Amino acid sequence: MSDLPAVVVGLSGGVDSSVAIASLKAQGHPVVGLTLWLMKGKGQCCSEGLVDAARLCEQLGVPHHIVDSREIFEKYIVNYLISGYANGVTPLPCSQCNRLVKFGPMLAYSREQLGIDYIATGHYAQVKYNPTSDRYELWRAVDRHKDQSYFLYDLPQEILAHVLFPLGQQTKAETRALAAQYGLPTASKPESQDLCLIEAHGSMRQFLDQYLPRQQGEIVDVYGRVLGYHQGIHHYTIGQRKGLGIAAPEPLYVVALDREHNRVIVGDRATAGRRECTVARVNWVSIPPPKEPMTATVQIRYRTPPVPVTIIPDANAEQVQLEFAEPQFGVTPGQAAVWYAGDRLLGGGIIQPFGTPTLHPLEATATHV
């Protein structure tokens, strides 16, 4: 009998989670597969993924459990998205899903139903215990291109203490090679490129149009000139350039969403830059909440490079002010700002709305162009 602890492995039916469970089994861990049934209706992640995960566990000769998580997914993700877009922000569902739908409920199910204290997933990230601070630290994956620590910033210490990331120290190419070596049926399965909701509904716009009414409004520049019309501010996000449906002599970007007046405000790239923003719902991961300002690097979107920042915490550090060394393009309310010291994730939170910019009409310019 193995001395290694038993692990419940979250399975999506993809190659990453398949290699995670196969690798842990090869190391000698007793393993159990667990798949969350997330979405109502038909869709890849609520049908094909379940079938592929079940087949994988049958091939590996390990138990497979399916947990019906459709209600909590609807409550914490679908409703969260709809509410956010309706209020003119661009929510980040993945970090909220990881905390409230996946990791938390997975660990609870593992302990309460199976008596197992550890869970694992196919995420590319690393957890390291620091005995000096007595904290479980979250670090970037070795494969920087695949690193998913940004989406995991909201996981609390009580979860990080009981989670394993078997893929954190290998590249995606090595994962594919292991899948072939293990003879896994998912070895050649193409990688998912979109949110599960987008895969199921075709696009975020199609998904949102099922819930939010189309309401025509103006697209204006920072001088208040009407450049065109939109069919709903939920179709737009800060920093967006493509798909604006307007003609202009220079590239224009969404710089603000004015929910009160149902307007999309556009400007040039310089207008879209911001030197600071407020971040709330902060989770301090690898360090305790600081009492004084500190410097770090920050990512304001998943694929944006980290940039220097000064972090100014409030009294209890549950909210911070970020001051960027240089103006940053695409700072978007609703998205996560996640700060690092090198590859160590320090903390993160949600970028807050920063008010509608004051428009400055040009007296000698016609209202419409």
Swiss-Prot record:
ATP binds at residues 10-17, 36, 122. Belongs to the MnmA/TRMU family. Residues 146-148, 301-302 are annotated as: Interaction with tRNA. The lineage of its organism: Bacteria, Bacillati, Cyanobacteriota, Cyanophyceae, Acaryochloridales. Its EC number is 2.8.1.13. It catalyses: S-sulfanyl-L-cysteinyl-[protein] + uridine(34) in tRNA + AH2 + ATP = 2-thiouridine(34) in tRNA + L-cysteinyl-[protein] + A + AMP + diphosphate + H(+). This is tRNA-specific 2-thiouridylase MnmA. Keywords: ATP-binding, Cytoplasm, Disulfide bond, Nucleotide-binding, RNA-binding, Transferase, tRNA processing, tRNA-binding. It comes from Thermosynechococcus vestitus (strain NIES-2133 / IAM M-273 / BP-1). SUPFAM superfamilies: Adenine nucleotide alpha hydrolases-like.
